[in-house]
Every structure is written in structure tokens, then in C-alpha cells.
Amino acid sequence: MTWASRAGALALACATAAIITWPQALHLTTTVSAHHDAAFSMWRLAWLAHAVVQQPARLFDANIFLPAHRTFAFSVATLLQGTLAVPLIWAGVPLGLIYNLLLIGGIATSALAMTGLVRYLTRSHTAALVAGVAFAALPYRVEHAMHLELQWSAFIPLTWWTLHRLVEQPTYRRGVACGVMVALQVLACVYYGVLLVLVLALTAPAYWWYAGTERLRLTLAPLLCGAAVAVCLTLPYLLPYAAAARIVGSRDTAEVARYSATLTSFLSSPATSLWWGWTADRWGSAELRLFPGLATLLLGALGLWWQQRRVVA
């Protein structure tokens, strides 16, 4: 890619993020979402900046729910975003501005990451740009535009990109890079991190089949090295969650079933959708409106048809 292409991809990603969060881009220092989660996210950022100075060894003993311990792990700690915010908070940058920059930045970097992955897989700059916009503008993402952690999904496509590169040319450096991407996704959003690890485990047989026995032999050691890196980077972060689970308990089977996606979840769009809002409560519910968008589906089908046509020809 040329520098002009990279600049164009960056501009498109930022424009998409600004549209999704509109009108916050016009009032970065004074406007945040009216949803209570925006205030909660700003508190999380501020707590981390406070705790790393005042009580770094007790970071997860936040100033809520006293006398309970590990209360910062009662929700997603957004440790990566908080770490990025620390120097800005210390410099006196308004907290609302920091939150908005991280929110919009999470969407934009997600678009750029998907653009990079698809560009690597297809060698098509146009397809990459379309995929980046589609990933950034998912109806699910728009519905949760107030949730800081749910906008930070860039490390999902980056994990797949590093994994493809590892299978293509197995090296320890690429294995470590893959592990780092997984760890960063966990630190940015535990939800996505857990789902990413599960999907990686489920798709491993397909990669082994694709790679073949000889390539698998070469890939296995770097892959295990990457897995070890991911565990080492995330274990100190996940231990407080295990401790918190002993305090508040874990989700029972009924609750897991209630919030698990079904096939009809992928037909449900947010109620704010102009064309598909009627599907919001018919086939979905909160957290389970996963329709990817008609344009995305049609373009995906067109891409499959076009690829098949090229193969046949």
C-alpha cells in the first residue's frame, strides 16, 4: 500500500467512527452519551490514573462496594484504555475529551485493523476498505456506541492477521506477535478476549488441515510460544476476576442460556434501525441483536460468487 492509500484508509476509518458517534465529534470536550455507561467508563479511566500512583498494588480494590475487595473486577476494567488515558489525565486533559477520543479511536482502529486483514487476504484495496467500514459500522456496534470496551475490537482481526502470517511462514517472532494480539484484546475487552480464544480453539483443526502435516510441525512450537506469551500477559489481569467470582458468584446455566446467541439473533437489528428496527424484539433482545446489515451480506455473497466465477473461468 502507498502512503496515499494508508492515509485514505485512515481518513475513512475516522470518518466512519465520527458518523457512528455523532455529534460527539463536534463537541469532544463537552458531550458524551446520555447513557450511564459513559459516566461509568470515565470513572474507570480516572480510577486507574489515581490507583497507579496512590495504591498500585491494590489497583482492583476500587472505591466502590466497600468493604468488598477486588471490586474493579466486578465489571470490565478496560485496563488497556485506562493505561492509554493515564498520561493524558495526569496532564490535565478533560476526562470527557479523553473518553471520546478513546471511544472514537476504538472504532477507527477496529476499521483499520479489518482493512489490513482483508487487504492481506485478498490483495484488494477496495475490498479491504469496504470490509473496514462494514466492521466499524456493524449495527451491534452502533447500538452499543456508549460502551467503551465494546468498541475496542481491533485486536480480533489483528490476531487473525498474525495467525495467517504465522501459518504462512512459521517463526517465533510471529508466534509471539499472535500471542500479544490475543493478550491486548483481553486487556481491552475481556468479553471479546474470551470469545476470541474460544473461536481460535474451535478453528484450530481447520488451520491444521490447511497447513498440512509438515507445516503444522513447523508452526506448532511458535504457536505454543505465542500461547505462553498470551497467558503470561493476561494471567495477572485475570486472577482478580477469579477472586471477584468467589465474591459475587458465577453465572448459572439459565443466565448463560438467556444471553447466548441463537440463529435468529443474527436476524435481529437494533430498534433504531430505519428499515430493520421491527426485528429488534421479534428475534432478539438486549445484547443479542446481531444482524450484520443487508449491504454486508449482499457484498459478501457477491464476493463469493465472483471468486467462484474466477475459479471456474
Predicted regions and their residues:
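Transmembrane-helix signature of polytopic, membrane-embedded enzymes
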Residues: M114-A137
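Transmembrane helices and adjacent periplasmic/lumenal helix-loop junctions
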Residues: Y140, H147, V180-W208, A230-L238
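Short hydrophobic alpha-helices at membrane interfaces in multi-pass membrane enzymes
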Residues: E168-A183, R217-L220
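Start-transfer (signal-anchor) and selected internal transmembrane alpha helices
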Residues: M1-W22, A221-A228, W305-A313
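Membrane-interface coil-to-helix junctions
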Residues: T16-A111, A134-S153, A257-G284
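Membrane-lumen/periplasm interface segments of specific transmembrane helices
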Residues: C189, C225-E255, L263, S269-G277, ...
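Specific aromatic-rich, kink-prone transmembrane helix
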Residues: S153-E168
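Perimembrane helix-loop-helix junctions
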Residues: R165-V167, L196-V229, Q307-V311
